[in-house]
């Protein structure tokens, strides 16, 4: 785990802060994609006001800050301590918003049934084995709660003659929309939707956005025997 934390600390050190205003002049906004001023807004999530929202791998907290301005009670966690410091310095004045340094699986395991919405925007859902992570996300959500995440769609295998991919410091679960739907179904999610958002003009890679809801489960009583 120390090597993973160190890799994400290096990542944090190389990032430039998000702009103070977007193209529309807003000071907070939610961005699901890897491109500025592109893609759907927070309406993908569903209801926000009054909801308890957890973001896994919130980085500098800019997406979560936006949800906080819309009336959500927000907790952002990130494995890299520097990210929490930057998030708190920029957004710590907003009400109903807090940031913690925590590893996603450890945090989820300690907070069952606590959130109405769990988000991961290019976050840990991409970097943790889903057979470990999805049951923990499901357990942390209230029945009917929304789980929404985004990451790059899987790339086709390299063609003969194409350069091999670079080695990565952290593993990545580049699943297709169908594979995510199957994994979510078996982890007790329902109403699963997947969409690949087209890239902006001149770019090649789109963005996969997945939404699912924690299945409401009836615990049936055993039938009475006569
Ligand atoms: C690609 S960045 C995305 C940050 C942010 N969501 C955004 O859209 O700008 C991934 C973030 O996930 C965090 N992260 C990666 N693995 C994690 C884990 N296992 N637990 C918690 N945070 C993690 C990293 O430190 C990093 O800040």
Give each language-model segment a name.
Residues 109-118:
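A short acidic, Gly/Pro-enriched loop at the edge of an enzyme's catalytic core
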Residues 117-131:
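A short SAM/SAH-binding and catalytic strip from SAM-dependent methyltransferases
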Residues 131-146:
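A short glycine-rich, Lys/Arg-flanked "PGG" loop and its adjoining helix->strand segment in the class I
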Residues 189-200:
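Conserved S-adenosyl-L-methionine
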Residues 198-226:
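Core SAM-dependent methyltransferase catalytic element
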């Amino acid at each position: 785990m120390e090597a993973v934390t160190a890799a994400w600390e290096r990542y944090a050190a190389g990032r430039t802060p998000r702009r103070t205003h977007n193209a529309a002049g807003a000071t907070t906004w939610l961005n699901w994609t890897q491109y500025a001023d592109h893609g759907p807004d927070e309406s993908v999530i569903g209801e926000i006001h009054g909801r308890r929202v957890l973001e896994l791998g919130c980085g500098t907290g800019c997406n979560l800050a936006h949800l906080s301005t819309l009336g959500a009670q927000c907790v952002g966690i990130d494995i890299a301590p520097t990210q929490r410091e930057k998030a708190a310095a920029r957004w710590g004045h907003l009400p109903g918003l807090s940031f913690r340094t925590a590893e996603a699986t450890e945090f989820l395991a300690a907070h069952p049934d606590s959130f109405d919405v769990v988000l991961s925007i290019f976050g840990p859902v991409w970097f943790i084995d889903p057979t470990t992570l999805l049951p923990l996300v499901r357990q942390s959500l209230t029945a009917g709660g929304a789980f929404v995440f985004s990451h790059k769609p899987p790339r086709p295998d390299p063609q003969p003659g194409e350069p091999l991919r670079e080695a990565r410091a952290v593993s990545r679960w580049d699943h297709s929309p169908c594979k995510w739907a199957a994994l979510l179904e078996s982890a007790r999610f329902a109403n699963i939707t997947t969409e690949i958002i087209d890239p902006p003009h001149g770019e090649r890679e789109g963005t996969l956005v997945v939404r699912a809801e924690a299945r409401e489960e009836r615990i049936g009583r055993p039938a009475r025997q006569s």
